[in-house]
């Protein structure tokens, strides 16, 4: 029996909202009913997003609040806004995939330090399931609130998960990740203005990045003990794409066999024999991983590539929603990369 599930997208005109719609419009079971946008309320989709003109949503108007009934909400909103909306949606019996960071970390204290607001909803923090399907698949299936991971944590955690799963000794984790400019969102910012960003790249949030406690929180939950992460992010002058290079020391093992065994049955994670490129994943939900052991230094070097808007955000959100409703995990996610 064909199942049709009605969907509302909050924050539908940001980059993650637009990427989400690209998947939802080809999804066999999800039907978009409400598109929420404070910036474009009252305007039709074809006026704001003309590339969706030939789709069934072209005449839908952007709203302040949903008017049609629905079962599933995707939140592509600022953290503080999601923080307020999630309890209301749960009380209405909706299932929620939240793409913000409002409910990702189990410790409320981390939010004051890294997000700048006081988190007073510990009950919902504990209720939320971290939406990394390759790690928390069974929990996601039984959840009504999934906290969709950040882009950097997705690329990094998939790069180290086999070590965590097998409980091999890890001393510390060093991460250097590079991201396209779309990771900064659609709102204009001077440092991402074309004349200043083109032929330029730079590190940021070197002292403190909000994705660091997110990574450490998941590592602690999966691995069973604390592991510190030294994380440095870099913005590069591309629209989208992410490469995460992870360095760690551990006991000697056949790292390629370990990764191939752990990810053997995963649809969207591919273990490869050469360093991956962002072009391989552009516009997709895939993650390509190259694990390597450097005999000279004794470091494991694991390189992962994702699309920061795909597996790093919106397409992973669809993967999570599929699991929440018992659908095929790859429904709406069969996009092939755009190349070159």
UniProtKB/Swiss-Prot annotation:
Coiled coil: none annotated. One of its GO terms (cellular component) is cytoplasm. Keywords: Amino-acid biosynthesis, Arginine biosynthesis, Cytoplasm, NADP, Oxidoreductase. InterPro entries: AGPR_AS, AGPR_type-1, NAD(P)-bd_dom_sf, NAGSA_dehydrogenase, Semialdehyde_DH_NAD-bd. The active site is at residue 151. Its EC number is 1.2.1.38. GO terms for molecular function: N-acetyl-gamma-glutamyl-phosphate reductase activity; NAD binding; NADP+ binding. The keyword Transcription does not apply. Pathway: Amino-acid biosynthesis; L-arginine biosynthesis; N(2)-acetyl-L-ornithine from L-glutamate: step 3/4. CDD domains: AGPR_1_C (cd23934), AGPR_1_N (cd17895). It catalyses: N-acetyl-L-glutamate 5-semialdehyde + phosphate + NADP(+) = N-acetyl-L-glutamyl 5-phosphate + NADPH + H(+). It is found in: Cytoplasm. Pfam families: Semialdhyde_dh, Semialdhyde_dhC_1. GO terms for biological process: L-arginine biosynthetic process. Catalyzes the NADPH-dependent reduction of N-acetyl-5-glutamyl phosphate to yield N-acetyl-L-glutamate 5-semialdehyde. This is N-acetyl-gamma-glutamyl-phosphate reductase. It comes from Aquifex aeolicus (strain VF5). The gene is argC.
């Amino acid at each position: 029996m064909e199942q049709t599930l009605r969907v509302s997208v909050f924050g539908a005109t940001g980059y993650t909202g637009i990427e989400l719609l690209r998947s939802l419009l080809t999804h066999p079971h999800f039907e978009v009913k409400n598109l929420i946008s404070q910036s474009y309320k009252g305007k039709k989709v074809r006026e704001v997003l003309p590339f969706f003109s030939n789709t069934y949503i072209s005449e839908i108007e952007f709203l302040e609040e949903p008017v049609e009934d629905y079962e599933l909400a995707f939140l592509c909103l600022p953290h503080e806004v999601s923080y307020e909306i999630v309890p209301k949606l749960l009380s209405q019996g909706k299932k929620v995939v939240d793409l913000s960071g409002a409910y990702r970390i189990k410790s409320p204290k981390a939010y004051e330090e890294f997000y700048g607001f006081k988190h007073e909803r510990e009950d919902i923090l504990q209720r939320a399931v971290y939406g990394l399907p390759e790690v928390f698949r069974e929990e996601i299936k039984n959840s009504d609130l999934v906290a969709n991971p950040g882009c950097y944590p997705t690329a990094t955690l998939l790069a180290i998960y086999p070590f965590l799963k097998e409980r091999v000794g890890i001393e510390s984790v060093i991460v250097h990740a590079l991201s396209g400019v779309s990771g900064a969102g659609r709102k204009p910012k001077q440092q991402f203005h074309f004349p200043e960003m083109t032929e330029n790249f730079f590190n940021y949030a070197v002292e403190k990045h909000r994705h660091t406690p997110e990574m450490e929180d998941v590592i602690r939950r999966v691995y069973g003990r604390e592991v510190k992460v030294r994380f440095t992010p870099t913005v590069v002058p591309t629209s989208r794409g992410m490469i995460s290079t992870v360095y760690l020391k551990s006991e000697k093992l056949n790292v390629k066999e370990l990764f191939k065994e752990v990810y053997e049955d995963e649809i969207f994670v591919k273990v490869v024999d050469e360093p991956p490129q962002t072009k391989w994943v552009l516009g997709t939900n895939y993650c390509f991983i190259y694990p390597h052991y450097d005999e000279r230094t004794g470091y494991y070097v694991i390189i992962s590539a994702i699309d920061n808007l795909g597996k790093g955000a919106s397409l992973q959100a669809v993967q999570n929603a599929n699991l929440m409703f018992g659908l095929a995990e790859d429904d709406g996610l069969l996009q092939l990369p755009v190349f070159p």
